[in-house]
Design a protein with these regions (language model features):
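A generic secondary-structure signal for well-formed alpha-helical elements
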Residues: 28-35, 47, 136
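A solvent-exposed, acidic/Ser-Thr-rich amphipathic alpha-helical stretch
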Residues: 36-98, 203
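Short beta-strand edge/turn micro-motifs at domain boundaries
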Residues: 89, 113-165, 174-176
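Short, cysteine-centered beta-strand-loop-beta hairpins and adjacent loop/turn segments enriched
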Residues: 97-109, 138-142
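A hydrophobic membrane-anchoring alpha-helix module
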Residues: 151-212
């Protein structure tokens, strides 16, 4: 089902699509604008988030983002999604952005990523995020004001190619980084993750089994 062309939308699925798009864009909007209480309403109670600097529940992710206290806006591009009854997977193409001082130079971090959302609709037909993760693609660090800075390649040798600059910048801020997340430098792992998403999307949960 994942990556197959969607069937023509019905009125119901079109409404689901718009509600999901509103939800995930609102979640990122809240993150970018420090709207922490509103951001919490986007996640299911048993949700899970696993990204470069964080692994835990949705509630903990919001609290940790608040504690980070750093402006890190997202440039959002296209989003594709697939449905199966009350479950959906949405893939949002985005660029993570923030500024960090490195060796007394203000640097701009741009990290291209696919943000992966697993979503579920409750009995009141309200969608919530049940899982959030990323597939990392490429990134860069550039001086905010044109200047020269010496960052030897050796300082990046321990990092993954798909999110080396992001990892470096987060380490500079004092955050540990998970180096075993999906990234396009490990295509087999990305494909494995896609298969896991497809399995989750297409399998029936206990609630569905009880209805049949």
């Amino acid at each position: 089902m994942l990556f197959e062309r969607n069937k023509p939308y019905t009125q119901e699925t079109l409404l689901d699509k718009e509600n999901i798009l509103e939800l995930i864009q609102f979640e990122r909007f809240c993150r970018d604008n420090a709207l922490w209480d509103s951001m919490r309403t986007c996640f299911a109670k048993d949700s899970h988030v696993n990204i470069s600097w964080f692994n835990g529940t949705g509630e903990e992710f919001v609290s940790s983002s608040e504690a980070m206290n750093r402006y890190a806006p997202h440039q959002i591009y296209n989003t594709q999604m697939w449905f199966n009854n009350h479950r959906a997977v949405a893939i949002m193409q985005a660029t993570i952005q923030f500024r960090v001082d490195i060796k007394n130079v203000e640097m701009q971090l741009d990290s291209d990523t696919k943000i992966i959302y697993c979503l579920e609709k409750d009995n009141d037909d309200v969608w919530y995020i049940s899982h959030l993760s990323c597939i990392y693609e490429k990134d860069k660090l550039t001086p905010v004001i044109p200047t020269t800075i010496n960052l030897p390649n050796s300082e990046f040798s321990e990092y993954r190619e798909s999110y080396a600059c992001l990892s470096y910048a987060l380490n500079e801020l004092g955050y540990d980084v998970n180096h075993d997340l999906p990234g396009i430098d490990r295509p087999d792992e990305v494909n494995k993750y896609y298969r896991q998403l497809d399995k989750w999307l297409t399998e029936k949960d206990d609630d569905e089994e009880e209805k049949h």
